[in-house]
Amino acid sequence: MTRPVRTRFAPSPTGFIHLGNIRSALYPWAFARKMKGTFVLRIEDTDVERSSQEAVDAILDGMQWLGLDFDEGPIYQMQRMDRYREVIAQMLEKGLAYPCYMSAEELDALRERQREAGLKPRYDGTWRPEPGKVLPEPPAGVKPVLRFRNPLTGTVVWDDAVKGRVEISNEELDDLVIARPDGTPIYNFCVVVDDMDMGITHVIRGDDHVNNTPRQINILNALGGEPPVYAHLPTVLNEQGEKMSKRHGAMSVMAYRDAGFLPEAVVNYLARLGWSHGDAEIFSREQFVEWFDLEHLGKSPAQYDHSKLSWLNAHYIKEADNARLAELAKPFLAALGIDDAAIATGPALEAVVGLMKDRATTVKEIAEGATMFYRVPAPEADALAQHVTDVVRPALADLVAALKAADWTKEAVSAALKATLGTHKLKMPQLAMPVRLLVAGTTHTPSIDAVLVLFGRDVVVSRIEAALA
């Protein structure tokens, strides 16, 4: 194929978009970028009753968050109705399509008879014009559907980039309805016209569309178009081994952002969910684009693993710039009651984030850990009784004296802690736990010396002294 590469993502805006859906955007986006081609966003909104602007916004927001920029679009099918009707008129004129007056009840009865006879249920061509054939008289007042004249013989063949060579006999296909009685064109027809008009060269989509492909190829051939390269991606399964879907508990793409995942982690994870480059597990967006090809798309269903995504996210959090993480943490802090005014009263948020990120798997966890720096501690009475004992109080008093005199560095604070331990014959947990509790309000913190340095000398000394008073 010598045409410039043009790929597309063509979602239906009928619900939220999950990771399995957005993978069908990631791969054509990457292929277009790799081949210096064009990536088109098409919104297939012909299902008027189920489509919504809210769902469109979710698609756009998810793509923007993940950095899947498109070169053309969004193109809405509902805004192309005149073009579809124009093509239908041409097909009727050329005998490529015909009106069919068979009612839904008649079609159901036909299919039932076929099933009882052990045949594949299908339309039998009652209204299909043929030389010498006498058609029934059109029933009065009935608006027909329009059907495509599918070839009766021959085979539809395509070399799928994932599935290999696929051959479907035309005898297996009936005459597809391409327009409803009200004249509204249906999905399988609109897709063909769109792909032809938009010059799509590669269709990378889920394998739930495989059954549509031979019908679409036949229509495309009838219209004189050039079929694209097809790559049908195996299903994404959830952790229970079911097809990923909202009904089976899938999260929306934006729910991952709201849970504190970084977009680069999600992109990296999605890239590996059905494609591989050797043993590479962690790679940048730029590396992904450079390495991506259709030859290494997986042929088996890929199963979502939340722990693997969390592991990747933890890696990217550790690598992320502290200033960026601080900005990302602010909405989570706000949800926990820590606003900008509260942040201004405590240590620099960038420094806090830098301390917390090595222990976190999400930005939300960073924010949860950071709250101790911006709240007055309120340790539970049971915890105080357990850790701030009469044995420890003299050591706490000596530690305060040492901290007042020490340089306020991590090394100096660490030395003061160790000296106090030596003097009072204590082990680190015996001293660190009560100090954490009194200063931070919790016994769960990163390294105690680093935490104390961030709180600042005045806060540390005053909080321990208040407990000893």
UniProtKB/Swiss-Prot annotation:
One of its GO terms (molecular function) is ATP binding. A motif ('HIGH' region) lies at residues 11-21. GO terms for biological process: glutamyl-tRNA aminoacylation. It holds the Pfam family Anticodon_2. Monomer. It is an enzyme of class 6 (ligase). This is Glutamate--tRNA ligase. One of its GO terms (cellular component) is cytosol. A motif ('KMSKS' region) lies at residues 243-247. It catalyses: tRNA(Glu) + L-glutamate + ATP = L-glutamyl-tRNA(Glu) + AMP + diphosphate. It is found in: Cytoplasm. Its EC number is 6.1.1.17. It comes from Burkholderia lata (strain ATCC 17760 / DSM 23089 / LMG 22485 / NCIMB 9086 / R18194 / 383). Catalyzes the attachment of glutamate to tRNA(Glu) in a two-step reaction: glutamate is first activated by ATP to form Glu-AMP and then transferred to the acceptor end of tRNA(Glu).
